[in-house]
């Protein structure tokens, strides 16, 4: 967060030591969780960091639910989509905010919808932890760490879609078009897909299934990227662009999950 709105901080040291000003960015919070796990392992409090992250993953998803709900009724939601239909000007679709002129206007309730989606991800991860995690894996494929990988995948898919619907102040200085959250989310999904592709290739050998999965991933990535470009360039293309992204973003996560299944015994 320090990198994005530099004007909020006097220095980097002040940003990481003075918490009375400024804000945070979710990718940084996730990185902090990973670093905390490294510290725990370094102190000898756990011998299996992957299993520790598996235990943390469902709670991490639930934390995002409360973070988004806590920011629902303030200016940090900053949804781009105006809700003009009176029937939709209430939760879960719309929420009222006070603009700079003191008037109330209704915007898409981005954080509320994201909280609902992350609650679904929490339930999915709990099922994955108590049921899927115990399934045997093919020789050479670790059983631990898969819940954390799935959290990274599905949380990133949700962020990739929902962050597009709001004005996010966290963007690269050389490119204000796509937010850092979206960039990190796309990279995370790609990293998890590469991880499971390598495992699957090691235990199953090279096959057409891998090619099909990667073609599907590229198509969904292109669909997501093109929709994001069009929705930023042409404001009146919200309906069609977000309809496409509502399909392609979850499909990216599903493709990762299907690749994971090829490593199960």
Feature annotation, model-predicted:
Residues 1-265:
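Hydrophobic, membrane-interfacing alpha helices
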